[in-house]
Structures are given as C-alpha cells and as structure tokens.
C-alpha cells in the first residue's frame, strides 16, 4: 500500500502527462522512467540547474529545453495521443500543442534508449548541492 501511495504522489504535480511520458519511455527505452529518471543527475526530475552530469542527464536537459521552446502550450496540463506504426511512435491528433509535447517526450525516450550504456547509478538521487552554479543555456 505504501508503494502505491508513493507512486500516486509522484504522479501529482510533475511536468507533462507523466503517465503518457512513462508509457513512451517503457515502449521506446524498455525501462521505467519513474524508477530510472525521476531523480537522476541535475536535470531528471523537478527543476534543473548546473550542467548535465552524463548523457542520460543530458536527455533530461534537452527535454526541459524542448518544453521551454513550446509557445502557447502547457506541458503540465495538455495531453497528447500517439500511435505505433511498424514499431515506430507517431505523434498525432488534432491538438498541435499535444503533438509538440509528444515530440518532446518521444525525443527524450529515444535519447534514454540511446544513452542507456552511460547510465550511472551514482547519479540516481543525486544531491542538488552538486548542481550549483550557472546553468547551461538551451
């Protein structure tokens, strides 16, 4: 029961549709975004400051930058749809904002998959104290 409560807390107040993003990460990278990336490095999870610690953390940095470039969209509330065609994720639907958010999430999931060999457990639950200083620009 306690584990369900923790998951419920994680699902509240996180940028984007965490359920959709988690599903994309599972489909593309084959691993749980919540388990591996909800608190990793300087950029995976809430906020972000300093420099990305490795390629996996850079995926989260790029994801934050992708969201920052969206105009007139709110990744915290807008939802999206996608489909699979020949094993590929295709973002779509009638909502242009949803499609853009989906593309950001898809790019991050692909990045996680492609940088899996650089994942380093020393950055899991990385202290924000190690992420001080000026942030890298997008």
From Swiss-Prot:
<keyword id="KW-0873">Pyrrolidone carboxylic acid</keyword>
<feature type="propeptide">
    <location>
        <begin position="81"/>
        <end position="83"/>
    </location>
</feature>
<dbReference type="InterPro" id="IPR033112">
    <property type="entry name" value="PLipase_A2_Asp_AS"/>
</dbReference>
<feature type="disulfide bond">
    <location>
        <begin position="42"/>
        <end position="131"/>
    </location>
</feature>
<dbReference type="GO" id="GO:0050482">
    <property type="term" value="P:arachidonate secretion"/>
</dbReference>
<keyword id="KW-1015">Disulfide bond</keyword>
<dbReference type="GO" id="GO:0005509">
    <property type="term" value="F:calcium ion binding"/>
</dbReference>
<dbReference type="GO" id="GO:0090729">
    <property type="term" value="F:toxin activity"/>
</dbReference>
<dbReference type="GO" id="GO:0047498">
    <property type="term" value="F:calcium-dependent phospholipase A2 activity"/>
</dbReference>
<feature type="disulfide bond">
    <location>
        <begin position="73"/>
        <end position="97"/>
    </location>
</feature>
<dbReference type="InterPro" id="IPR016090">
    <property type="entry name" value="PLipase_A2_dom"/>
</dbReference>
<keyword id="KW-0528">Neurotoxin</keyword>
<dbReference type="GO" id="GO:0006644">
    <property type="term" value="P:phospholipid metabolic process"/>
</dbReference>
<feature type="propeptide">
    <location>
        <begin position="120"/>
        <end position="126"/>
    </location>
</feature>
<feature type="disulfide bond">
    <location>
        <begin position="91"/>
        <end position="102"/>
    </location>
</feature>
<feature type="disulfide bond">
    <location>
        <begin position="44"/>
        <end position="60"/>
    </location>
</feature>
<keyword id="KW-0732">Signal</keyword>
<keyword id="KW-0638">Presynaptic neurotoxin</keyword>
<dbReference type="GO" id="GO:0005543">
    <property type="term" value="F:phospholipid binding"/>
</dbReference>
<comment type="similarity">
    <text>Belongs to the phospholipase A2 family. Group II subfamily. D49 sub-subfamily.</text>
</comment>
<dbReference type="Pfam" id="PF00068">
    <property type="entry name" value="Phospholip_A2_1"/>
</dbReference>
<dbReference type="GO" id="GO:0005576">
    <property type="term" value="C:extracellular region"/>
</dbReference>
<dbReference type="GO" id="GO:0016042">
    <property type="term" value="P:lipid catabolic process"/>
</dbReference>
<feature type="modified residue" description="Pyrrolidone carboxylic acid">
    <location>
        <position position="84"/>
    </location>
</feature>
<dbReference type="InterPro" id="IPR001211">
    <property type="entry name" value="PLipase_A2"/>
</dbReference>
<dbReference type="GO" id="GO:0042130">
    <property type="term" value="P:negative regulation of T cell proliferation"/>
</dbReference>
<feature type="disulfide bond">
    <location>
        <begin position="65"/>
        <end position="138"/>
    </location>
</feature>
<feature type="disulfide bond">
    <location>
        <begin position="66"/>
        <end position="104"/>
    </location>
</feature>
<comment type="subunit">
    <text>Heterodimer of an acidic and a basic chain. The acidic subunit is non-toxic, without enzymatic activity and comprises 3 peptides that are cross-linked by 5 disulfide bridges. The basic subunit is toxic, has phospholipase A2 activity and is composed of a single chain.</text>
</comment>
<keyword id="KW-0800">Toxin</keyword>
<feature type="disulfide bond">
    <location>
        <begin position="59"/>
        <end position="111"/>
    </location>
</feature>
<protein>
    <recommendedName>
        <fullName>Phospholipase A2 homolog mojave toxin acidic chain</fullName>
    </recommendedName>
</protein>
<comment type="function">
    <text>Snake venom phospholipase A2 (PLA2) that inhibits neuromuscular transmission by blocking acetylcholine release from the nerve termini.</text>
</comment>
<dbReference type="InterPro" id="IPR036444">
    <property type="entry name" value="PLipase_A2_dom_sf"/>
</dbReference>
<feature type="signal peptide">
    <location>
        <begin position="1"/>
        <end position="40"/>
    </location>
</feature>
<keyword id="KW-0964">Secreted</keyword>
<dbReference type="InterPro" id="IPR033113">
    <property type="entry name" value="PLipase_A2_His_AS"/>
</dbReference>
């Amino acid at each position: 029961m306690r584990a369900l409560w923790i998951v419920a807390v994680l699902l509240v107040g996180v940028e984007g549709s965490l359920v959709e993003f988690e599903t994309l990460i599972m489909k593309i990278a084959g691993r749980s975004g919540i388990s591996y990336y909800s608190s990793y490095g300087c950029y995976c999870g809430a906020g972000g400051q300093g420099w990305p610690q490795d390629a996996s953390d850079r995926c989260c940095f790029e994801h934050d930058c992708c969201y920052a470039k969206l105009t007139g969209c709110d990744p915290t509330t807008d939802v999206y749809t996608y489909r699979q065609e020949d094993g590929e994720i295709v973002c779509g639907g009638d909502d242009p904002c949803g499609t853009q958010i989906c593309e950001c999430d898809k790019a991050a999931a692909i990045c996680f998959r492609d940088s899996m060999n650089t994942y380093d457990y020393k950055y899991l639950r990385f202290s924000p104290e190690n992420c001080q200083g000026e942030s890298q620009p997008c």
